[in-house]
């Protein structure tokens, strides 16, 4: 019997996969526990439609990420920060991913999720700093920061 897996089943199939399994196993286990459904022509058509919609959505997200990368890679895109500095040359406050995200939105109208900004630790130094940002699993860019003394 052909079934469409609704969830990953270890050793049998992954979600969205169409596979031939023994009839008894399909009826008594997979279908009863909502792990799979029978692969009728209507169900297969529905699955193909969902997969196409998902691919289209992923392509749009990737295109958006590439557009943001183009903006961030532009030399003019440099996020400005004015911070109070102590006698040792370190800032009093630290610059976090959240602060960078907010300033990027404020100064350039570019929305980047703070969780995508890769910071090992908050920035406390002044000067020009480049911070990597993972916009998509395939797209990585760098945000240029200019941290000056207030």
Swiss-Prot record:
GO molecular function, one term: rRNA binding
Name of the featured protein: Large ribosomal subunit protein bL9
Gene Ontology CC entries for this record: ribonucleoprotein complex; ribosome
Alphabetical list of Gene3D superfamilies matching this protein: Ribosomal protein L9, C-terminal domain, Ribosomal protein L9, N-terminal domain
Function of the protein: Binds to the 23S rRNA.
Pfam families in UniProt: Ribosomal_L9_C, Ribosomal_L9_N
Family that this chain belongs to: Belongs to the bacterial ribosomal protein bL9 family.
Species this protein is from: Streptococcus equi subsp. equi (strain 4047)
């Amino acid at each position: 019997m052909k079934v469409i897996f609704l969830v990953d089943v270890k050793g049998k199939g992954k979600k969205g996969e169409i596979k031939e399994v023994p009839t008894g196993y399909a009826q008594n286990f997979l279908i009863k526990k909502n792990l799979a459904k029978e692969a009728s022509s209507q169900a297969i058509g529905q699955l193909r439609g969902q997969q196409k919609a998902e691919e289209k959505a992923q392509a749009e997200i990737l295109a958006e990420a590439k557009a943001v990368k183009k903006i961030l890679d532009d030399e003019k895109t440099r996020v400005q920060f004015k911070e109070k500095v102590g006698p040792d040359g370190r800032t009093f406050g630290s610059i976090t991913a959240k602060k960078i995200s907010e300033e990027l939105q404020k100064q350039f109208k570019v929305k980047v999720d703070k969780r995508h900004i890769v910071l090992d630790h908050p920035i406390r130094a002044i000067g020009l700093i480049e911070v990597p940002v993972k916009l998509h699993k395939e797209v990585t860019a760098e945000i240029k920061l200019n941290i000056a003394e207030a």
